């Protein structure tokens, strides 16, 4: 294999496009964060009234990362607003369902109220509870997600009417008519200035205990020292999974991990913001078609951060974006995006997305990104030729047949094909060239 490819002069000329594109995104971050905080304040005001009507539902002011995450995005996917239940989760019975556990990493359970124990009486009323048979010696009955959602919906309607009547929220900011009860959440539209933000209101059971299944990922590199263990030692919450079942949720843990990546030097979060905007504007036609979500791209960044550990990987903006692109292309080609904390769970399985069509769009961008990056007439000009030739998809599919390819050296081969490897470490170059020799018959001769 020849030495790693060096950037061509044409590529060097195009580098400022990435920074112009990022600058345009950053110019929107502060207004987006302000819009979100105003909308969040409206919803929190309503939830305060919900709590006054029914103390079983708590207002949580402690989790301030949603505005940070919303500012990173260009997409308009719904934001979660969690409503904790006033219940001692450690006093409840966590009961596995009788059916076989699914193989997608989700831990499903019933929430049982024990016959022995005090302080749970508020959850044994008919509106949220289904009693067990008299023959069950341990369990009095179960807290039912569908019933909890129904109660919460009625409370939200009453709270919205109250807040509007007493001028606690701005006119037109929120309308009870927009409230929709879905299977696993309540959807609500909140107006903030000229922007309308969609929220998913989700009842959640806070737990102090972490999930044993997460212990295996606490040693992953790529994060500030000790941060992964500290974050994953926090409790794993429970949210509705169906009408009767609850499931573990790691969404908050993932957002905390994203925040930790933002404390590191380099363009990790910038690369995520760029791909989310390209996804929204180009791959999803300004949100008019179904496609990848911010959550998918966030997962790609988390994986890229443990695959590419050198500061040089993230020092240059274009190269940082391609660290995410090669991981994303591999996931699309193999039709498998592993959950970062539950790798056995495939986030693309059952998504209903046209993964083949999405792959073509992502590959087209990776090969010739300039057209999607031009946001001003002064950026018009001839695009350089495609960065890759044939054979890429066969190379990208290798991890499907041999999981050992899911490693830095393999992804370095992909980076070199896109001419953005730019790593001087001799051991890493040697490992990359060794993998290339194994894959050259499948990956083609271009490099």
Curated annotation (Swiss-Prot):
InterPro entries assigned: Mab-21_HhH/H2TH-like, MAB21L/cGLR
Source organism, top-level taxon: Eukaryota
Family annotation (Gene3D superfamilies): 1.10.1410.40
Pfam family, one: Mab-21_C
Designated name of the protein: Protein mab-21-like 4
């Amino acid at each position: 294999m020849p030495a790693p490819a060096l950037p061509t002069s044409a590529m060097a000329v195009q580098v400022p496009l990435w920074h112009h594109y990022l600058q345009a995104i950053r110019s929107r971050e502060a207004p987006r964060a302000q819009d979100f905080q105003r909308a969040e304040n409206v919803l929190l005001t309503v939830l305060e009234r919900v709590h006054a009507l029914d103390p079983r539902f708590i207002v949580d002011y402690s989790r301030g990362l949603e505005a940070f995450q919303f500012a990173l995005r260009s997409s308009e996917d719904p934001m979660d607003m969690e409503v904790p239940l006033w219940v001692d989760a450690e006093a409840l019975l966590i009961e596995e369902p009788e059916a076989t556990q699914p193989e997608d990493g989700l831990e499903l359970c019933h929430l049982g109220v024990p016959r022995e124990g005090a302080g749970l009486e508020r959850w044994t009323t008919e509106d949220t509870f289904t009693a067990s048979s008299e023959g069950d010696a341990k369990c009095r009955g179960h807290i039912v997600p569908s019933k909890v959602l129904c109660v919460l919906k009625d409370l939200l309607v009453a709270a919205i009417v109250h807040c509007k009547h007493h001028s606690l929220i701005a006119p037109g900011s929120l309308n009870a008519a927009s409230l929709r009860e879905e299977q696993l959440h309540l959807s609500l539209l909140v107006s903030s200035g000229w922007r309308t933000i969609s929220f998913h209101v989700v009842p959640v059971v806070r737990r102090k205990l972490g999930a044993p299944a997460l212990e295996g990922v606490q040693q992953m590199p790529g994060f500030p020292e000790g941060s992964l263990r500290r974050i994953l030692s926090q409790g794993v919450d429970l949210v509705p999974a169906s009408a009767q079942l609850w499931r573990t949720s790691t969404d908050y843990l993932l957002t905390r991990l994203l925040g930790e990546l933002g404390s590191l030097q380099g363009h990790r979060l910038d690369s995520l913001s760029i791909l989310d905007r390209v996804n929204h504007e180009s791959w999803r036609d300004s949100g008019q078609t179904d496609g990848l979500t911010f959550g998918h791209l966030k997962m790609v960044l988390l994986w890229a951060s443990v695959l590419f550990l050198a500061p040089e990987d993230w020092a240059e903006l274009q190269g940082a974006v391609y660290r995410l692109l090669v991981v994303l292309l591999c996931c699309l080609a193999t039709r498998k995006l592993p959950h970062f904390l539950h790798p056995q769970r495939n986030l693309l399985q059952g998504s209903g997305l046209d993964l083949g069509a999405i792959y073509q769009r992502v590959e087209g961008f990776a090969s010739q990104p300039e057209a999607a990056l031009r946001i001003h007439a002064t950026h018009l000009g001839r695009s350089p030729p495609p960065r890759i030739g044939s054979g890429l998809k066969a190379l990208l599919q290798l991890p499907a047949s041999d999981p050992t390819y899911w490693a830095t050296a393999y992804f370095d081969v992909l980076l070199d094909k896109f001419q953005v490897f730019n790593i001087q470490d001799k051991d890493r170059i040697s490992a990359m060239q060794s993998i290339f020799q194994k894959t050259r018959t499948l990956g083609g001769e271009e490099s």
